[in-house]
Amino acid sequence: MRPIHIANLDKPRPVVVLTRDLVRSSMTNVTVAPITSTIRGLYSEVRVGQENNLEGPGVISCDNIQTIPRTALGRQIGWLFAKQETALGVAINHAFDLEITSVEAVLQAQQKQGS
């Protein structure tokens, strides 16, 4: 499950940390997706709310993914659930206009490149 932290961006705001746990402590910078209360209904958004330990409803804005200094990452306040993490992958796919239809397709493409 992906952690939700408070980060010092334009103002202190919740973010989902996208950098994987395994390397986060050794990285100078981490990649995050900000959470906002402005809900536009875009495919590049993932709904979150009180079930994620947030104050109210909002969305993860995958159109605004950014890399920040790890030191700008504050305390952890919540987590994404498994179904939200799946939705996050789809939203990132939309935000970057990637032609990925499934994890299996990616793995098959990687195997073909390696042969």
Residue ranges and their predicted role:
Residues 1-4:
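Loop/turn positions that initiate beta-strands
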Residues 52-115:
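C-terminal terminal-subdomain/extension
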